[in-house]
């Protein structure tokens, strides 16, 4: 049970009615971050990872191709 989280229903620990998410890199104030919001900066051959706007997870983006150098 996570009663300290304002997004979390204390009984089910799922998002409260009307809220999108409880936690995650793409969740802020119980709502999904906008699509295209950087959730993880790229390093080396990895590109930036971006929020989708429909999930609190930060999906992995593909590696940079040689054409992008």
Swiss-Prot record:
Pfam family of the protein (one): Disintegrin
Assigned keywords, A-Z: Cell adhesion impairing toxin, Disulfide bond, Hemostasis impairing toxin, Platelet aggregation inhibiting toxin, Secreted, Toxin
Main location: secreted
Source domain of life: Eukaryota
Molecular function GO terms recorded: toxin activity
Expression (tissue specificity): Expressed by the venom gland.
SMART domains per the UniProt record, alphabetical: DISIN (SM00050)
Organism the protein comes from: Eristicophis macmahoni (Leaf-nosed viper)
Residue span(s) of domain Disintegrin: 1-66
Intrachain disulfide bonds: 7-30, 21-27, 26-51, 39-58
Lineage: Eukaryota, Metazoa, Chordata, Craniata, Vertebrata
Classification via SUPFAM superfamilies: Blood coagulation inhibitor (disintegrin) (SSF57552)
Assembly description: Heterodimer with EMF10B; disulfide-linked.
Motif Cell attachment site in this chain: 43-45
Family: Belongs to the disintegrin family. Dimeric disintegrin subfamily.
Protein name: Disintegrin EMF10A
Compartments (UniProt record): Secreted
Primary role: Extremely potent and selective inhibitor of integrin alpha-5/beta-1 (ITGA5/ITGB1). Partially inhibits adhesion of cells expressing alpha-IIb/beta-3 (ITGA2B/ITGB3), alpha-V/beta-3 (ITGAV/ITGB3), and alpha-4/beta-1 (ITGA4/ITGB1) to appropriate ligands only at concentration higher than 500 nM. Weakly inhibits ADP-induced platelet aggregation.
Gene Ontology cellular component list: extracellular region
Signal peptide limits: none
């Amino acid at each position: 049970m996570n009663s300290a989280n304002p997004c979390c229903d204390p009984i089910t620990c799922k998002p409260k009615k009307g809220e999108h998410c409880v936690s995650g890199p793409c969740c802020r104030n119980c709502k999904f971050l906008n699509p295209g919001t950087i959730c993880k900066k790229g390093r080396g051959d990895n590109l930036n990872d971006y929020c989708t706007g429909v999930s609190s997870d930060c999906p992995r983006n593909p590696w940079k191709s040689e054409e992008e150098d």
